[in-house]
Amino acid sequence: MKVQTKWFGEIEVSEDKIITFDKGIIGFEDWKKYTLVYDAEKEENISIIWLQAIDEPTLALPVMKPEFVYETYDPVVEDELLKSLGDDIQDDNIRVYCALTVPQDITKMTINLKAPIIVDFDTMKGIQLIADNSEYQVRSVSYTHLRA
């Protein structure tokens, strides 16, 4: 299917690449379907990925695998909350992303470690949860960690 985006123009997205967030994403609860946009040639080493809404061209969130910034990232979430991803969750199918805030001065970029976005690539379901870890913040410095 063809998807209109503000930042990437018209892109082709196959149905099996659409991630459904039954509850939406915090702050964007009305939009349920997304896809990940990135440079496929750099897939293994890419740091910033875009979570693009299928039905809203202007809604694209920069996200990142948190281990690029915090190697020991381990969010604590209630297992009950993960049930919306499917009945048989396998660790190999799960990916965790965290939203980025990228201001004009990129050195002030932050990552939201408090509310990870969890995707099961077997069921293509996603959910954003609030981690119980008190050490994780909504705005954690990320630029200096990326540069290291």
Show where each model-derived region lies.
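A cross-family signal for N-terminal binding/gating loops and helix N-caps
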Residues: 1-72, 82-128, 134-139
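Residues that recognize and position ribonucleotide moieties
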Residues: 75
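Conserved small/polar residues in nucleotide/adenosyl-binding loops
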Residues: 144-148
